[in-house]
């Protein structure tokens, strides 16, 4: 088959028939150059507009250093710095359940470096988990164009291993074994709540 300009049509084999761990989807739309944050933003808008869930990205805290007051009723910030977030990236409500999660991307092909996480973030995740919150990480391997949901309950052992200076990263294979693969699709782009449903079911069985 040819395009109207006479050039041949070449099928992108990397995006057709792609499956993973038993996935049967015939089409994988792929990241298409977007960041994980943008994919989540588009998905959250989809969930919100259809009354499925209310999930938002937490604003990054800012440390104001210098303020100028040209008028009594006005203030101009001349200097400010982004502070290290004290909690996770996202939180919200889904079917009456509190969700709290961190989103991370890595260019590494074989592992996820744990120095991307901060101890205060992990403490926050632990506190939410102890209150029966649904807590997890969304990890994207950019070079592989693969996204995984890693439950906090499974992440804990890797973090403890990191603290003990046994191993400073989590391999792709460990994440595949302990997490859930999330395929890209048309709408929402990253339907991670479908995977959250599986996580809630699995954790409810584990906690019984």
Swiss-Prot record:
Source organism (scientific name): Staphylococcus saprophyticus subsp. saprophyticus (strain ATCC 15305 / DSM 20229 / NCIMB 8711 / NCTC 7292 / S-41)
Cofactor(s) it depends on: Mg(2+)
Coiled coil among keywords: no
Pfam families hit by this protein: RecU (PF03838)
Similarity annotation: Belongs to the RecU family.
Subcellular location(s) per record: Cytoplasm
Biological process, per Gene Ontology: chromosome segregation; DNA recombination; DNA repair
Principal place of residence: cytoplasm
Function field: Endonuclease that resolves Holliday junction intermediates in genetic recombination. Cleaves mobile four-strand junctions by introducing symmetrical nicks in paired strands. Promotes annealing of linear ssDNA with homologous dsDNA. Required for DNA repair, homologous recombination and chromosome segregation.
Protein name per its UniProtKB record: Holliday junction resolvase RecU
Classification via NCBIfam families: PRK02234.1-2, PRK02234.1-4, PRK02234.1-5, recU
Lineage: Bacteria, Bacillati, Bacillota, Bacilli, Bacillales
């Amino acid at each position: 088959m040819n395009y109207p300009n006479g050039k041949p049509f070449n099928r992108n084999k990397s995006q057709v028939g792609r499956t993973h761990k038993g996935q049967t989807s015939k089409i994988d739309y792929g990241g298409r150059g977007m960041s994980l944050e943008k994919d989540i933003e588009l998905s959250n808008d989809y969930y919100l507009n259809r009354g499925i869930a209310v999930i938002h990205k937490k604003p990054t805290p800012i440390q104001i250093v210098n303020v100028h007051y040209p008028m009594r009723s006005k203030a101009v910030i001349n200097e400010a710095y982004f502070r290290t977030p004290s909690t996770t990236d996202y939180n919200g409500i889904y079917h009456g359940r509190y969700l709290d999660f961190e989103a991370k991307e890595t260019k590494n092909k074989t592992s996820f470096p744990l120095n991307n996480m901060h101890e205060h973030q992990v403490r926050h995740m632990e506190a939410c988990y102890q209150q029966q919150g649904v807590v997890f990480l969304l990890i994207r391997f950019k070079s592989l164009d693969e996204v995984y949901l890693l439950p906090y309950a499974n992440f804990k052992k890797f973090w403890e291993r990191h603290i003990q200076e046994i191993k400073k990263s989590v391999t792709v294979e460990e994440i595949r074994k302990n997490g859930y693969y999330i395929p890209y699709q048309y709408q929402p782009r990253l339907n991670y709540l479908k995977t959250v449903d599986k996580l809630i079911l699995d954790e409810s069985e584990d906690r019984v």
